[in-house]
From Swiss-Prot:
Pfam entry (one): ATE_C
Key words of the record: Acyltransferase, Cytoplasm, Transferase
GO biological process assignments: ubiquitin-dependent protein catabolic process via the N-end rule pathway
Keyword Cytoplasm appears in the UniProt entry: yes
Source species: Acidovorax ebreus (strain TPSY)
Protein name, as recorded: Aspartate/glutamate leucyltransferase
Amino acid sequence: MTQLNDLPLQSLQFYATAPYPCSYLPERQARSQVATPSHLIQNDVYSGLVARGFRRSGMFTYRPYCDGCQACTPLRVVVDPFKPDRSQRRAWKRHAGLQARVLRLCYLPEHYQLYLRYQNARHAGGGMDQDSIDQYTQFLLQSRVNSRLVEFRETGADGQPGTLKMVSILDVLEDGLSAVYTFYEPEPGASYGTYNVLWQVQQARTLGLPYVYLGYWIEQSPKMNYKARFMPHELRIDGRWQRSKS
């Protein structure tokens, strides 16, 4: 284990995992750097780690630490000057009738079934489409930081919440929101993911938070490069956040 001198965050230690198959770029091996012990990573420390390029998966806080590859670039949307483009405005208008309900992390069978439908449609054969309830819970519903579960439902005929369409897990940081994971009904062309990012930007603006952290942008990965369409954004390159010029 090694300590990072540039992270004055209590007594954290950091270790590198063994190589494992990369989830985003075929035929590549990935490694992660994991922050420990997890019980010291409360919200203030976690906010500092996210600002330095870390992410959270359940109780694990990590960042890419790959040999000879730096394709994963942390990206955050700058909230105050953000303006949606034409396609994003269409997605916002299309789903304007969705009702959002913010909850503490909790297990509901309806959420889990939606998660499985999403994984089977979007990531079939990747392993997560076979996640058990325990695996789902460990991945999304365990946290020591300020986390929320947001469910999005259609408006029912009587004005009450209707059919579940999307669930999003997010963390509330000192300087923004961090999009942990989102899954939704796999309807072709529905643009639920775009709508969700726009919703988080709106929430951050309401809360007076300057950033929405979208995780890692990977230019070569179609699953990840959509994030660059949210402008303006900043990329963390060589240890510094830099405003995108495009």
